[in-house]
Regions:
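Conserved phosphate- and dinucleotide-binding cores of soluble alpha/beta proteins
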Residues: 19, 87-93, 97-260
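A residue-level detector for conformationally permissive "hinge/kink" positions
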Residues: 4, 40, 44, 61, ...
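Short, Lys/Arg-enriched N-terminal segments with co-localized hydrophobic residues
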Residues: 2-15
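N-terminal active-site beta-alpha-beta segment that forms phosphate/nucleotide-binding
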Residues: 14-130, 134-137
Length: 260
């Protein structure tokens, strides 16, 4: 089911395209179908990819489609949103490792075409400039997949006083470190900094697809997509994207159900 939520914001009408899903499995299926359609439309497309728990189900669905002969990743190129600073790419909690484990190693993608920030580059300014050049070289993603943090962050663009344009070196907030602690043995093992594509880089994507599930994301959904556009709710900037789709389950939409 597709519902359109239209709201006024300052000068004009902003329309957020929302696909309502029953649960996480349904979110994953619907998101995978959108990505598969993009690959069929343009076999050499550039996919912007995300990590964390939200897209795992989507990746499983894509792998199943590949194994069933429905998808060919051989020409696909990818740009990942972010990477922890200080974790080598073979560390089991690095996002490079995550992508290999959850997608790349299970499909016929050329991993030379898979781009992820280098978390081991000590030259923060140099790494940010390098990754900006990668993103700009592609002209942005054809389709950017995103998750949404409980505090409204996209990538590692945390709540702040102004939107950041390009790739940046960020200090993670305590709430994000707390949320990521479950992936590490103890809290002090969680990286405190990361490289992340900036808001401007994300907005360069031709299409943006955000997946969201669970009641823990309900407030962020309400704040980001039914509230004012402000850097304190980083995901709210997506209201201004010309081709943005939110795929969310009933729990994630629970605080805005009466608005749909």
């Amino acid at each position: 089911m597709i519902k359109l939520s239209s709201k006024k914001y300052r000068k004009g009408i902003i329309t957020v395209r929302i696909i309502c899903a029953k649960d996480y499995a349904d979110v994953s299926r619907k998101a995978a179908n959108i990505i598969a359609a993009q690959i069929h439309l343009k076999p050499n497309c550039v996919l912007g990819l995300a990590t964390g728990s939200s897209p795992v189900g989507t990746y499983k669905e894509l792998i199943a489609k590949y194994e069933n002969g429905e998808l060919d990743f051989s020409q696909v190129k990818t740009i990942n949103l972010d990477e922890y600073v200080g974790l080598p790419k073979d560390h089991d909690q690095s996002y490079a490792y995550f992508m290999r484990s959850n997608l790349f190693d299970h499909v016929n993608i050329d991993q030379a075409n898979c781009n992820i920030p280098n978390g081991m580059n000590p030259d923060a300014a140099g790494e940010c400039a390098r990754y900006d050049a990668v993103v700009d070289g592609f002209g942005g993603a054809d389709l950017q997949l995103l998750g949404l943090g409980p505090n409204g962050h996209i990538g590692f663009n945390e709540p702040c006083d102004e939107f950041v344009n390009g790739t940046n070196h960020v200090k993670l907030t305590d709430s994000t470190i707390d949320a990521n602690q479950r992936f590490f043995e103890k809290r002090e093992d969680v990286p405190t900094h990361a490289y992340t594509m900036g808001i401007g880089s994300i907005m360069k994507a031709k299409r943006v697809l955000l997946v969201c599930n669970g009641e823990g994301k309900a407030q962020a959904v309400k704040d980001c997509f039914f509230g004012p556009i402000k850097p304190q709710s980083p995901g709210s900037i997506l209201q201004l994207h010309p081709d943005f789709t939110l795929v969310a389950d009933e729990e994630a939409l629970s605080l805005v159900a009466d608005l749909l």
